Amino acid sequence: MVRNVDDLDFHLPSHAQDMLDGLQRLRSQPKLADVTLLVGGRELPCHRGLLALSSPYFHAMFAGDFAESFSARVELRDVEPAVVGQLVDFVYTGRLTITQGNVEALTRTAARLHFPSVQKVCGRYLQQQLDAANCLGICEFGEQQGLLGVAAKAWAFLRENFEAVAREDEFLQLPRERLVTCLAGDLLQVQPEQSRLEALMRWVRHDPQARAAHLPELLSLVHLDAVPRPCVQQLLASEPLIQESEACRAALSQGHDGAPLALQQKLEEVLVVVGGQALEEEEAGEEPTPGLGNFAFYNSKAKRWMALPDFPDYHKWGFSLAALNNNIYVTGGSRGTKTDTWSTTQAWCFPLKEASWKPVAPMLKPRTNHASAALNGEIYVIGGTTLDVVEVESYDPYTDSWTPVSPALKYVSNFSAAGCRGRLYLVGSSACKYNALALQCYNPVTDAWSVIASPFLPKYLSSPRCAALHGELYLIGDNTKKVYVYDPGANLWQKVQSQHSLHENGALVPLGDALYVTGGRWQGMEGDYHVEMEAYDTVRDTWTRHGALPRLWLYHGASTVFLDVSKWTQPSGPTQEH
């Protein structure tokens, strides 16, 4: 057909939504609905075409050669009427309210009737609700319902928060097999080891008649040589469950005396740093070379830097580092020379258990000078692309895949991000000098951002860095020694004790109950470059200097993990200042 210059292509933007709204209204007129679902005595008029589009279960039912394919009334058994009603409403409106009271029923019914989008959002909701009181139950529920990603993230939460979980009632109800799995975890992050011993004793005391026989086996899972001697002596002297068992007495005595038990690992929380180009390399105009060491950890107890296996991509800057499930992830960054650079989509992982770097699935977009943060069992990367929008994506380590996330509402290019209280917080401004900071918050359950108007938010910070500790968000910049803390519950910022020094191109990370700041600074008329570190005691509101980083890194990323410090004996540094 020949088009005429007067032809008009008309598009009604609201047409699709109008049709859905109209079909929803037609449900109240049974004559205009072509199928009625019968659920526990409740009748739900609807349209089989919409059900088939929303659910493979209904598509197979209505498109196949079954009695239901031709029947005007279809009965669904062994499902809750109210929940099916919610799912049918979702088909017509795209809206669903998930609560702690209905999430399990919704998950089960969505799995039964094959509503994949509902299963996915219920899984995200469960991850959002993870805490010490429910993580064991959510882990078991996830395994039962085939939500293996949810189960994996609940298991990771247990590993990272074992001491808190062990104090909850759910822990006391664990079957023996499950408890053994918990205690035997190679990466169970327990400090001190006494906590593991106290947890198993609490479990046995909850039902001593049935559980006392398992005590010798459970004791073999504890690093008894790391338990303080007074604790062991007290158990031997006053605990009936120990006194009545020769095997238990022998295990405690033998383990603490260092008799022929195998040497077991002792995990300690340490600060890890991956360095980019260093000052000496820039001055020489050279590419970084292997052998200089670009990956190290700081043992805050011994106050020493020790070398780790080098990050294999030496000539890179603008990358971001985050830790998740006690694994270290490095994403993005730029490669090439100063005059010819390009961003990468590369992502690397350093699993502590394997102790070597390996590539993981590449990001969907190349990113440089972006932020990354762990939240609810996933890694989020924020910004760093070439568009004038803050593009976001998330990485699921269970599926080794990246998923696009809603972009931030307000564009920022001078920013930092951190996960806190189940939300992702983005603090930043545009690159324009003295452009005011904005605070944005992302809810992973609804995949939605909001801009938070918060009193006393600092007006401007150059290269802001933020980190979460004890449910609060700490914020610093490289143009000031001032330190700010944000309480999300009260929506209030306040100042705390200032740092001793300025820190450029560094990181702010929580380690135990303290915050560590790393980064360099130029000092003196000749422009000497120093890379210093200091720690903030949140209880005493004081800063303490911790010396230099191993090398004069102009760019680096940092985080914290738990590792067996006895396995790493090669020193890293000390730095020779210029």
UniProtKB/Swiss-Prot annotation:
BACK domain sequence ranges: 153-255
InterPro entries listed in its UniProt record: BACK (IPR011705), BTB-kelch_protein (IPR017096), BTB/POZ_dom (IPR000210), Kelch-typ_b-propeller (IPR015915), Kelch_1 (IPR006652), KLHL30_BACK (IPR030582), SKP1/BTB/POZ_sf (IPR011333)
GO biological process terms on file: proteasome-mediated ubiquitin-dependent protein catabolic process
BTB domain mapped to chain residues: 33-100
GO molecular-function term, one example from the UniProt record: ubiquitin-like ligase-substrate adaptor activity
One cellular component (GO) term of this entry: cytoplasm
Pfam family, one: Kelch_KLHDC2_KLHL20_DRC7
Ranges of the Kelch repeats in the UniProt entry: 270-326, 327-377, 378-422, 424-471, 473-513, 514-563
PROSITE patterns named among the record's database cross-references: BTB (PS50097)
Listed SMART domains: BACK, BTB, Kelch
Record key words, sorted: Kelch repeat, Repeat
Keyword Ion transport annotated: no
Protein name, UniProt field: Kelch-like protein 30
